[in-house]
Amino acid sequence: MNNFELILLYYGKKIFMSFVKDFKLLLKARYPIIYINTYEEERVEYVIKSAIQSFTNRAVYSWDFIEGYCNNPNDNGYAIRNPLQALEFIDKFTLETPLLVLLKDFHLFLNDISVSRKLRNLAKSLRNQSKTIVIIASDLTIPLNLSDSITILHFPLPKNSEIKKELLRIQESLGYSLPEHSLDNLVKASQGLSLEKIRRVLAKIIATYKEINVESLDLVFKEKQQLISQTQILEFYNPVTKISDIGGLNELKSWLKFRAASFSKRAEEYGLPIPKGLLLVGIQGTGKSLTAKSIANEWNLPLLKLDVGRLFGGIIGESEARVRQMIQFAETISPCILWIDEIDKAFTGSNFNNDSGTTKRVFGTFITWLSEKKSPVFVVATANNIDSLPPELLRKGRFDEVFFIGLPDLKERECIFKVHLKKIRPKSWSTYDTEILSAQSNRFSGAEIEESIYEAMHIAFNENREFTTSDILNSLKRVVPLAYTSQKNIEELEDWASAGKIRLAS
């Protein structure tokens, strides 16, 4: 087995070969400038050099701002702190051997007029030569004037097979092994981390626990939370809400239960398509967000929440880069749940006309991914105002289903009261008259029911006694439900849903 085959085995056959295949194709087609977006600088450099050795004889040089050309045999350290001189070296390279140059962190210099002009000139001349520039950068920031000259290639983070190989290697070096089930849990917990991050986390685990065990998974989750928070657009949730914690919504619950095994290997072998997602439309406080959290728990999948407001940046092109970053990260973590709360606030009709096309481009990128994605990312989007959503979002093929979550009926309200009271008073919940409470809370949302219980608790707490059914009834009388304060809007939404244009969750 040669060196390239060993690396192929180590990094995982499918993903590694996909990247190598694309990279080889770009080299053969003489693409002058390749931009590889990755945090794993050492890993991608190692993979590129090894892949090149397997099919071509090329001189490979690498440059960075501090050390210059560190492996130039004629002038080690050439072009230190001088990106323009680094490009001139490529231009003047006269050896007959084909050349590949790795420029690290070079995205930081692309807005310099001298550097960008030199790159554009090189892009023209390199098409007729066996020279290729590879920019390795953690951020995807390409000025518009270079967009035609540069080809983007994403280097994926390791998938489960790669992570497992690395964990087995580390286990072997430490001289002990985890049970298969514990190993699988650790692999799943490590999804979305680079191999270097995984090594560091394992070092921290060993320093803390003296061994790799089930309890050490918390450190992996904390590392992942920190990594996700650095994106500033995604938030990692550890879902604790169960589907049984939600009152009513029986149709929606049945739909979710029916598809609980859709991400399994058995479903894939059967030929079932990967589920795309759900759009939950309805009145505020009816449990849309709670449902999103419960799906992750029910299906035992990680939950990412997208802050749609932070997708939009002030710099031209920044918003588009952020949505691509979001997609790339979600696909790396997959299988997972991507929760997009109040999507209607981001993609309203007015936004499409007021920001020079940014919303339109971001929406276009998102909607294309939603329709064409092959990765097991299940999108759960919630919306309060159906009228403000673009019609393209509601077309068949975007989501597997669109559900309307309305105000709970009499039986559902009683169920909601029971759910909350069981959680608050697990031993004495049955002493409360949920039938009367349900009858006296007509047009209340689930959130308003919950708030009335807590209001009753506050009153009883200040009087140093246990709260009663009467306390809750008094709290209900003091609350003016949203169904009355926004009566017209809610009735229009209910009429639209009852006309058969959307599937009802109850």
Curated annotation (Swiss-Prot):
It comes from the Eukaryota. Keywords: ATP-binding, Chloroplast, Nucleotide-binding, Plastid. One of its GO terms (cellular component) is chloroplast. This is Uncharacterized AAA domain-containing protein ycf46. Belongs to the AAA ATPase family. Highly divergent. SUPFAM superfamilies: P-loop containing nucleoside triphosphate hydrolases (SSF52540). Gene3D superfamilies: 1.10.8.60, P-loop containing nucleotide triphosphate hydrolases. It is found in: Plastid, Chloroplast. ATP binds at G282, I283, Q284, G285, T286, G287, K288, S289. GO terms for molecular function: ATP binding; ATP hydrolysis activity. It comes from Guillardia theta (Cryptophyte). Pfam families: AAA (PF00004). The gene is ycf46.
